[in-house]
From Swiss-Prot:
GO terms for cellular component: plasma membrane. The keyword Transport applies. The lineage of its organism: Bacteria, Pseudomonadati, Pseudomonadota, Gammaproteobacteria, Enterobacterales. The gene is cysZ. Belongs to the CysZ family. The chain crosses the membrane at residues 31-51, 75-95, 151-171, 222-242. Pfam families: EI24. This is Sulfate transporter CysZ. It comes from Escherichia coli O139:H28 (strain E24377A / ETEC). Disulfide bonds: none annotated.
Amino acid sequence: MVSSFTSAPRSGFYYFAQGWKLVSQPGIRRFVILPLLVNILLMGGAFWWLFTQLDVWIPTLMSYVPDWLQWLSYLLWPLAVISVLLVFGYFFSTIANWIAAPFNGLLAEQLEARLTGATPPDTGIFGIMKDVPRIMKREWQKFAWYLPRAIVLLIIYFIPGIGQTVAPVLWFLFSAWMLAIQYCDYPFDNHKVPFKEMRTALRTRKITNMQFGALTSLFTMIPLLNLFIMPVAVCGATAMWVDCYRDKHAMWR
């Protein structure tokens, strides 16, 4: 079925909402199962462990607050909790996406075919196996781009005052952008668009992608809802690709 989407781009909030609708479309649900199972097993277990550690980590993080900011501790405490959830939420999400990357790519490909009526290359288990080395190389490129920037932000967390006030905001913005890259890359990679070219394309609609990534980041922190976020984000990002980028970058039509 060809999508009824218009070619006019919408907001990132719109595409995130579309992801929740598209994930349950007939013919798409079977491609959602494996990414969903990976996410439920990993994110469910990881966040259960994380919440058991908060009582230890939050006081440690708050110990870096200087004496002159102690009067703000009632505000800094929730910021510290959010900071831990953001950092580890993205870390857990990255691991889940590495494991599920071949299946996320297949989900993006099949959804794009349904939305556009285009014919994708031959797929199946052998097609996935053949593409695994290329897909893992692409995941490594994303990780190599992310890691040095994340280290700088983590160092900022240990600067008294700044680490408890400015760093959580910077990390949220960085996480939003990185999650937009993570999920939008699946349809781009299906069309063999180079990683650098993909990032350049996303920057042309930076506000839209930041909106999409911000909502994805927020939902990654919410128990239960974060179990479903991976296939939802893949579907939303694929809808954005169809509307905003496909005309210029598509390899198959």
